[in-house]
């Protein structure tokens, strides 16, 4: 069956997101042992990732559990979002842009409350693809089989008609179990080359000539 849609992860794929050491710096500043910050915030991080709590709830939990005043809270949250958002993988984003209208395009992201607004402001993802499925809005996260079904339903395609690109092995494995054609992202040239091979083998091809494209990523 011909490929009709291509879906991309965000962090580590459409965004270049190296570890900036934010957690470690704040642990040192607050006198916490290694891993202590995430231990205190674990349930808030988990709730924020599937939308069971609001962004305001997260801020309140940070204030109370880390003992931050308003100025410290503002700096801490800004640090977290700077690391979360990273920088644009411009080469891949341009490739995604040119897949339309020949293919339906989507984003499937394990996210956090507030991510849609911040990523739209930074990168305009809502204008880049046809559909975005965020874990914090859908109440489930990769590799839950239901979230792969959801993105296919939103794009009005079957899983066998869909290519999915992610940098996490478990998310790639989950997509394959769900019947999607999944690619483990390593860099732009590799990922685009594998996408192009799948599109060509399905009898269509993108016609973009990006088989050896490079760029961020």
Please tell me what each predicted stretch does.
Residues 91-102:
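Catalytic-core regions built around general acid/base machinery
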Residues 104-106, 181:
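Proline-centered loop/turn at the N-terminus of a beta-strand
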Residues 9-12, 51, 99, 107, ...:
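Generic structural signal for small/hydrophobic residues in well-ordered secondary structure
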Residues 2-93, 112:
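N-terminal helical cap/lid subdomain that shapes the substrate entry/recognition surface
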Residues 1-4, 8, 112-217:
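Asp-based, Mg2+/Mn2+-dependent phosphohydrolase catalytic module
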């Amino acid at each position: 069956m011909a490929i009709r849609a291509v879906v991309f992860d965000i962090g580590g794929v459409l965004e270049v997101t190296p570890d900036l050491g934010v957690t470690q710096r704040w642990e040192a500043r607050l006198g916490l042992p290694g891993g202590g910050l995430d231990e205190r915030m674990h349930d808030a991080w988990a709730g924020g990732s599937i939308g069971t709590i609001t962004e305001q709830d997260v801020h309140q939990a940070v204030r109370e559990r880390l003992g931050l005043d308003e100025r410290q809270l503002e700096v801490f949250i800004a640090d977290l979002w700077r690391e979360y958002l990273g920088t644009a993988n411009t080469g891949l984003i341009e490739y995604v842009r040119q897949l339309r209208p020949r293919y339906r395009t989507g984003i499937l992201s394990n996210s956090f409350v507030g991510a849609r607004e911040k990523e739209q402001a930074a990168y305009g993802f809502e204008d880049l693809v046809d559909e975005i499925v965020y874990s914090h809005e859908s109440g489930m996260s990769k590799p839950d089989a239901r979230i792969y079904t959801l993105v296919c339903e939103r794009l009005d395609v079957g899983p066998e008609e869909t290519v999915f690109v992610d940098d996490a092995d478990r998310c790639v494995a989950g997509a394959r179990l769900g019947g999607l054609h999944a690619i483990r992202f390593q860099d732009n040239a590799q990922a685009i080359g594998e996408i192009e091979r799948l599109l060509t083998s399905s009898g269509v091809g993108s016609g973009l000539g990006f088989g050896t494209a490079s760029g961020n990523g």
